[in-house]
A protein has these predicted regions:
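One-carbon transfer enzymes
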Residues: 1-232, 241, 279-282, 288, ...
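C-terminal active-site/capping subdomain that shapes the small-molecule cofactor and substrate pocket
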Residues: 222-312
Length: 312
């Protein structure tokens, strides 16, 4: 089929590569504009753009799409059979949704209708879900409300991070998109309404990343650390210094006295243990202020933490 592909991060790049390798004719690739990144604020291309450049595909990088008559007319002129949308990062106007013969097909990182919205993978991990998956769907003007086509489910390991689940789902999403295009092409693709029992996955707020030792229990803190790894990480302050937590585990214990956030043990042999509500946080990977992330044993060899000190 003749395809216009819209996507931006590595999650989308996996799908673009799969569609390309399946032999479809990719008429154009639409991705976000290059953005400044890092200390030098150097302009960086998206993973989707990098792949498109490597394969000499036509690239569009509109700053906005809504009311962008020139861009919309150019896509109309290309006359795609279908538009594939994977983690593009912008809401598409009705004019785009109606351009192609088969409409716009989306790869969404959840088992719809659960976790509609911008951050489905992150919220599944943040909430401690034991399963998630990928859904392909026909797009409509709502927020991930279109009829579903295919689904595939996976388990979320108790220690898996958002980054690890993201990587798994990107590969599953790529495979499902190719299968979806095949079914659309031969006329066997189903249209399954989502129903009304849905949940939302809004964009993440940076304020979420500070650990609330008093109001979150140990399991919730672990899920927070998992869910925000590697996007932003979670943090707390110790003696006025910002400490980031990248991996932790939980030891269940409801009988500890003392304030939550208090250091119970800290040495390079045994590690770092912090009192939390309904349990103990065992730190596995950590990052000091203005330092690199490292395992807790290496961190404690160069940084002394006093027993009884408190994370705030």
């Amino acid at each position: 089929m003749k395809i216009v592909f819209m996507g931006t991060p590595d999650f989308a790049k996996e799908s673009l590569e799969a569609v390309y390798n399946a032999g479809h004719e990719i008429l154009a690739v639409v991705t976000n504009p290059d953005r400044p990144k890092g200390r030098g604020m150097k302009l960086v291309s998206s993973p989707v753009k990098e792949f498109a450049l490597d394969k000499n595909l036509k690239i569009y990088q509109p700053e906005k799409i809504k009311n962008n008559v020139k861009f919309i007319d150019e896509i109309k002129g290309i006359q795609p059979d279908v538009i594939c949308v994977v983690a593009y990062g912008k809401i598409l106007p009705k004019e785009i949704l109606e351009i192609s013969k088969y409409g716009c097909i989306n790869v969404h990182g959840s088992l719809l209708p659960q976790y509609r919205g911008a951050a489905p993978i992150q919220w599944a991990v943040l909430n401690g879900d034991k399963k998630t998956g990928v859904t392909t769907m026909y797009m409509d003007t709502g927020m991930d409300t279109g009829d579903m086509i295919l689904k595939e489910e996976i388990e979320i390991g108790k220690d898996e991070t958002t980054g690890e689940v993201w990587e798994k789902l990107s590969k599953i999403g790529a495979k499902l998109l190719v299968e979806t295009l095949q079914q659309i092409g031969n006329g066997t693709a189903p249209r399954i309404p989502q129903g009304t029992d849905f949940s939302m996955a809004p964009m993440l707020d940076k304020e979420m990343s500070k650990i609330d030792w008093n109001n979150k229990n140990a399991n919730q803190i672990k899920n927070l650390v998992r869910g925000l790894n590697p996007i932003m990480g979670t943090y707390s302050y110790l003696d006025g210094k910002k400490i980031k937590f990248w991996r932790v585990d939980v030891i269940q214990d409801n009988n500890l006295d003392g304030e939550n956030g208090t250091v119970l043990r800290a040495d390079s042999r045994d590690g770092l243990y912090i009192k939390a509500k309904n349990g103990i946080i065992k730190v596995i990977e950590i990052q000091g202020e203005n330092a690199k992330k490292m395992n807790i044993q290496d961190f404690l060899r160069g940084n002394k933490i006093e027993i009884g000190s408190k994370f705030e």
